[in-house]
Regions:
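Generic recognition of short, well-ordered alpha-helical interface segments
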Residues: 5, 21-24, 52-56, 95, ...
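A short N-terminal interaction module
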Residues: 1-57
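A generic alpha-helix structural signal
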Residues: 7, 11, 58-61, 101, ...
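Generic leucine side-chain signal with a strong bias for well-ordered alpha-helical environments
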Residues: 14, 34, 41, 49, ...
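Secondary-structure boundary/capping signal
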Residues: 18-22, 37-38, 69, 112, ...
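Conserved AdoMet
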Residues: 32-107
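Conserved SAM/SAH cofactor-binding pocket of Class I
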Residues: 99-201
Length: 202
């Protein structure tokens, strides 16, 4: 089966299961299975897909139909122009959370007029998306700390810190429990506020 035919099949299956953006999702999924960029699919649309890759593609289509988010299948989510590793140990960074980063950066700009360096805490960091993004934009103008109660979430956040070549410092803590001695110019937080019984429907 040709790549273009596989994309058409995937799109139709997702459409029948009321999954929106089915063309985009199908292409992202196939690119993930093949380990290529989406542009490759356009250039090689007439190429034959081997049986092994087709089986993997079908398996992942079934995961989508059964409610597994694309980001947990590909282990990737773009946020603030950066790529973040995500798995079931963290919530998927949402586009509207970028507003928090943007507003924090505005506040940082004001504070930097008065301070040579600012200290920021991202409380309940999860994937580390907010902390890593802030450190990426501010660089050596800031010291960014990130905390979470979950060891597994911190492992993901540390992975993203390394992946994006940032220098966030991590603290395992239940809210302020292990960071009471620290003082910060800015504390930012976007804790999990979604009811656990609806997470799989996001």
């Amino acid at each position: 089966m040709k790549i273009k035919e596989v994309i058409e099949e995937g799109k139709n299956v997702l459409s029948k299961n009321n999954i929106e953006d089915n063309v985009i999702i199908t292409r992202e999924l196939l690119a993930f299975v093949l380990g290529v960029k989406k542009q490759y699919l356009v250039i090689h649309f007439a190429d034959e897909l081997n049986a092994e890759d087709y089986i993997k593609f079908k398996e992942n289509i079934n995961k989508l139909i059964n409610g597994k988010p694309l980001q947990y299948i590909t282990n990737n989510q773009e946020f603030m122009g950066l790529n973040f590793f995500v798995n079931e140990n963290v919530l998927i960074p949402q586009p509207d959370t970028e507003i928090i980063v943007e507003e924090t950066l505005k506040k940082c700009k004001e504070l930097l007029l008065k301070n040579g360096k600012i200290k920021i805490l991202d409380l309940c960091t999860g994937s580390g998306a907010i902390a890593v993004s802030l450190e990426n934009f501010l660089g050596d103008k800031s010291e960014v700390f990130a905390s979470d109660i979950s060891t597994k979430a911190l492992e993901v956040a540390k992975n993203n810190n390394e992946k994006n070549n940032t220098n966030v410092r991590f603290i395992e803590s239940n809210l302020f429990e292990n960071i009471q001695e620290q003082k910060f110019n800015i504390i930012v937080s976007n804790p999990p506020y979604i009811r656990s019984n609806v997470i799989n429907n996001l």
